[in-house]
C-alpha cells in the first residue's frame, strides 16, 4: 500500500466514524453487484455524427500551429505541454477555440493549467475577453495572469460563492467546467448542471473536463468515484448540449486526422489522459 492509498483509507475511516467530513459514504446493500460500465455505446452515434465538427477544431488548431513549438518546455505563467492536468488536445483545442470564437466572457469553474491556455489565447488574439475563475486552490498558479488581461479570481468553491456570483453568459461566451466531478446533491456539479446550464441561452460554448464519453472512466480512477460524465451523457442524449469537440473520441477514433495535422506534433506524456468535451447549448429550459 502506497502513501496516497493509506491517506485515502484514513480519510475514509475518519468520515465513516463521524470524526470529520472528508468525503461521502453512501450505504447500498447491492453495492457489491455494481460494475462501472466500460462505455456507453448508445451515445456513439452522437459522436460519430459530430466528427465533421471535431475536424473543424483540428483545422483551427492547424491555423494556430505555431503554439506547438511555442508552448514546448515553457515556464509559468505560460501554458506548456509537459503536464498531465490539461494535456495535448485539451490545451490545443481550448487555445484554438478562444482564438477562433473570440468570446466576450469566459467563466471558469476549476482553474489551473486550463486557465493558462485560455488566457494566452485571449492575449495572443488581442481580445477584450473578461475572465472569471472560481477555484479555492487552483492546480497551477494563475496569479501572474491578472496583469495581462481582465481576469478576476474567486478563491472559493461554487457552493460558497453561490450561482448568483456567476455573470450572465451570452451566445458565443464560454463556460469552462473542471470542478469536483462529484454528482451529488449540493455539489458544484449539481449546481452547474441543475441550475446554471438550464438557464443559459442557445449558443454558449460549454467545456467539461475529465469526460471520456462514450467510453467509461479509466480503471485507475475507480477510487475517485467520479460521476459527472453520467450527467453530461443525459444532457447530450436529451439534446440540451450539441457536441463541438471531444478529445477522447478524436484521439482514439480519429488518430489518422490527428497525426496528419499540427495536433499530431504535440508531446503527450504516457500518464496523461486527454479528456476535454466541448458542446454548445441548445437554449434555456422554458420559463427558466
Q: What is each PLM-predicted segment?
A:
Residues 1-288:
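A short alpha-helical cap/connector motif
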